[in-house]
Amino acid sequence: MKKKNSKTKAAMTLAWGFVREAGLPLGEAMHRAYLNIALDARLKLGQSVEIAYRKADGTIREAIAVAARAGQDLVKGTGHGAPDRNYLYFDVGKNEFRCFCKARLLVVL
């Protein structure tokens, strides 16, 4: 019995969501899906990661991100997390929590 490649399946699922919701071409959507998977893997290891993403107004934000899970108990709110299409992180430079649409991720350094 062959072992299924879960990384490829996750990338395809994420990419098709980008195609449907953001109207990205499939090649660009696959590239951004693999960037999101790489970002998630590095943050789960506890590393700080330099990222860049396009904001809704078209400007590009560069940030040093760490996993938001570590400090989420400090956040008060409605109890509803960020939607699955958004990525929540803690911005070290601004010292606050931020989020961005996964389809807008440009670079993971």
What residues fall within each predicted segment?
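Basic, alpha-helical nucleic-acid-binding regions used in initiation and control of genome expression
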Residues: 44-48
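Short, ordered coil/turn segments that flank beta-strands lining enzyme active or ligand-binding pockets
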Residues: 56, 93
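A short beta-strand micro-motif
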Residues: 49-55
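Acidic, low-complexity, intrinsically disordered interaction modules
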Residues: 59, 64-74, 78-80
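Amphipathic alpha-helical segments in structured regions that serve as interaction surfaces
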Residues: 2-22, 29-34
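Short aromatic-glycine-enriched beta-strand elements
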Residues: 80-88
